[in-house]
Regions:
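Signal-transmission coiled-coils
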Residues: 37-252, 267, 271
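Conserved ATP-binding N-box helix of the HATPase_c
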Residues: 236-240, 244, 266-297, 306, ...
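ATP-lid-like helix-loop hinge signature
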Residues: 280-315, 341-366, 371, 375
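Glycine-rich G1-box
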Residues: 319-320
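Flexible, glycine-/charge-rich segments associated with ATP-binding catalytic modules
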Residues: 21-58, 63-73, 94-97, 128, ...
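N-terminal chloroplast transit peptides
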Residues: 1-15
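Short acidic-aromatic loop segments in the C-terminal HATPase_c
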Residues: 330-334
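Conserved catalytic submotifs in the C-terminal HATPase_c
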Residues: 250-261
Length: 442
């Protein structure tokens, strides 16, 4: 089920203005000014509060029967939860050495987070639909402002990699990204519920005010079919690589196993992970067989459905991962190509971490318009598909582990790579806001 046409048109009209404002924030923020002094005690009240995690099942059950009362309850949950989650991450940044916090990229992120914290904690209780509309405007504004966070964090950890142990910096980055996902999930879910409530096909007089057979409840896709997502993402990635490289050695994608496996999930999260795994495999095979006569072997994807999980194995014959890169595969800070990664990240003013933000031709975008669910942020960010940032796999693991899944890679040098993605099938696992390493340390 796609978003209503008026909503899409509204986004198109505002795309150019929003892109300009994001670029302005990106360029102006390189002029680094000392942050204003703030009392540490301002955060104390919210740091002492416990984060209230949610599961996909809770999001689904809450949004199925959407009434005005439930919509306002959702708004007030987001209103109180966002400053709490922001406060915990602000305190984490405050605990870093000053020389790290003074980095202009980290300083910008800190200022954005503190500004959002002050903004949300001063929002009064939401009692009416008009209050909710004003709150949604605040959410959209903040989501747009924070599109610069991922590239800035990535540049910050690369520039500060000699100031803290690499493992500590990676864990810090993982925690901030996981928390960022958590905030965007609850914010975008509420925006989607509000859009559903205000849509013309939503009837106020009915007891159950949403379609029980709808594929989406807010941003939660109830019938996520692994085979369909793989084939859809695979076609988009094949077209992107063919367009960017001009290569005719693009391998086919073979999908086998439990082809009917379905599960509830955030579609944009799964598309990002699958897209990244397929992109790496297709690029490796295409480069290995470029200039050779034989047809490149296919990328083989096996889907296995277990009682509580769905496991996907992506196998390629692209020659494996070079030995000098393998130890740094999941790191945001380490690796032999850190300097190149830093230069490439400087070309990315904003990033939503979705598959759709990769720049492709207008023909491909038009062809996939009705097959990919449109995000409210997709039109605000774009980057060339061949621009290597070095954060795709670490970011994919963050997405996978966020809903209590996992992502592992096994490389056979000289042959290829097997990637294993495990997804919780039942949707009953709470979001993993805290990293496993942090939990173990408690």
């Amino acid at each position: 089920m796609l978003r209503s046409r008026p909503a899409r048109c509204w986004r198109i009209l505002h795309t150019q203005r929003d892109r300009l404002s994001i670029r302005a924030l990106h360029s102006e923020s390189f002029v680094h000014n000392p942050p204003p002094w703030r009392p540490v005690s301002a955060l104390d009240e919210y740091v002492e509060r416990q984060i209230r995690p949610i599961s996909l099942r809770q999001l689904t059950f809450f949004g199925r029967t959407l009434t005005e009362s439930r919509l306002l309850s959702s708004a007030n949950y987001v209103r109180t939860e966002l400053p709490t989650r922001l406060a915990h991450r602000l305190r984490d940044i405050q605990k870093l050495p000053y020389v790290v916090v003074a980095n202009p990229h980290f300083s910008l992120v800190y200022e954005l987070y503190y500004k959002a914290f002050e903004r949300f904690r001063t929002v009064p209780e939401i009692r009416t639909l008009d209050d909710n509309d004003r709150f949604c405007d605040i959410l959209r504004k903040t989501l747009k402002e924070h599109l610069v966070v991922i590239p800035r964090l990535a540049m910050g950890v690369l520039e500060c990699r000699g100031l803290l142990p690499a493992d500590a910096m990676d864990q810090f980055m993982n925690t901030l990204l996981r928390a960022r996902i958590s905030r965007r999930v609850i914010a975008e879910q509420h925006l989607a519920l509000t859009e559903t409530f205000n849509s013309p096909w939503h009837f106020p007089g009915s007891q159950d005010r949403t379609d029980l057979n709808a594929d989406f409840v807010g941003e939660v896709f109830l019938k996520c079919n692994a085979k369909e997502v793989i084939e859809r993402c695979g076609k988009l990635v094949q077209d992107m690589i063919r367009q960017s490289s001009g290569s005719d050695k693009i391998p086919e994608i073979s999908v086998q196993g439990h082809l009917d496996a379905t599960f509830p999930y955030m579609l944009s999260h799964l598309e990002y992970i699958i897209g990244e795994l397929l992109r790496n495999s297709i690029q490796a095979v295409s480069e290995r067989y470029q200039g050779l006569q034989q047809t490149p072997p296919p990328i083989e994807v096996l889907i296995c459905e277990a009682p509580q999980h769905v496991i996907m194995r992506v196998s390629d014959q692209g020659g494996g991962i070079p030995r000098e890169i393998l130890p740094y595969l999941w790191s945001f800070t380490k690796g032999p190509h850190s300097k190149v990664r830093l230069e490439n990240l400087g070309q990315v003013p904003a990033m939503a971490a979705t598959l759709q933000e990769l720049s492709v031709s207008s023909e491909i975008k038009h062809a996939d318009k009705e097959t990919f669910r449109e995000s409210s942020l997709d039109t605000l960010t774009s980057r060339p598909p061949d621009l290597r940032l070095g954060i795709g796999l670490p970011m994919s693991r963050v997405y996978a582990e966020y809903w209590a899944g996992s992502l592992e890679l096994h490389s056979l040098e000289g042959y290829g790579v097997d990637a294993f993605l495990q997804i919780s099938k039942l949707g009953n696992k709470n979001e993993q806001v805290t990293t496993r390493a942090a939990i173990d340390a408690v």
